[in-house]
């Protein structure tokens, strides 16, 4: 197993375990409580991650089967490393807010109370999909963002973006949990 693969899968697994241990005991009311009209609930944070990550599945499946070729843009974009690093660094800054780029990944207001279990299953699934791309060259395989069609980044950066995005929303959910008016039961 290459070191990138083991690092990414370990970090992804760690996020899933932390989410299960921190939020797995919460009630439906707690999962769906919002800190304000514009704020997301804990459940919405994790529903959003599932929806977002699933947008990469078709690409990952094609990469793992060896059926995917870089597009012309992906082959010749001089900015792939720049965009990858930009996204990674932006996701690390919690103060910077992003608006979801497409309604497809905006979670509904009411989230199923078993979202933590669903997220745990999702983490297992995405880790398996990442492992299946082990034989691809993560530095030479360039993918296009499912949200901004002119933004490309290396597969290695794509995986780092997934991890940073998950960690960002984990921190957001922790802030909701620590909010002054968060329901105790």
Predicted regions and their residues:
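Short, Lys/Arg-rich amphipathic segments at extreme N-termini
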Residues: 12-31
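Hydrophobic alpha-helical core bundles mediating ligand binding, dimerization, or RNAP-core interactions
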Residues: 16-19, 53, 119, 123-126
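Short, contiguous alpha-helical
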Residues: 33-90, 124, 131-132, 136-185
């Amino acid at each position: 197993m290459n070191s990138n693969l083991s690092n990414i899968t370990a970090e992804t697994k760690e996020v899933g375990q932390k989410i299960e241990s921190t939020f797995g005991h919460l009630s439906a009311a707690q999962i769906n409580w919002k800190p304000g009209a514009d704020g997301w609930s804990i459940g919405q944070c994790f529903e959003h991650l599932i929806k977002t990550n699933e947008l990469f599945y078709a690409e990952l499946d094609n990469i793992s089967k060896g059926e995917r070729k870089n597009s012309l843009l992906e082959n010749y974009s001089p900015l792939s490393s720049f965009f990858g690093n930009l996204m990674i660094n932006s996701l690390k800054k919690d103060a910077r807010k992003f608006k979801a780029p497409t309604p497809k990944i905006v979670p509904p207001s009411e989230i199923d109370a078993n979202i933590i279990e669903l997220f745990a299953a999702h983490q297992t699934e995405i880790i398996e999909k990442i492992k299946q791309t082990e034989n691809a060259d993560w530095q030479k395989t360039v993918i296009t963002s499912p949200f901004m069609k002119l933004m490309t980044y290396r597969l290695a950066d794509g995986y780092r973006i997934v991890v940073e995005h998950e960690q960002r929303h984990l921190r957001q959910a922790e802030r909701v949990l620590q909010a002054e008016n968060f329901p105790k039961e």
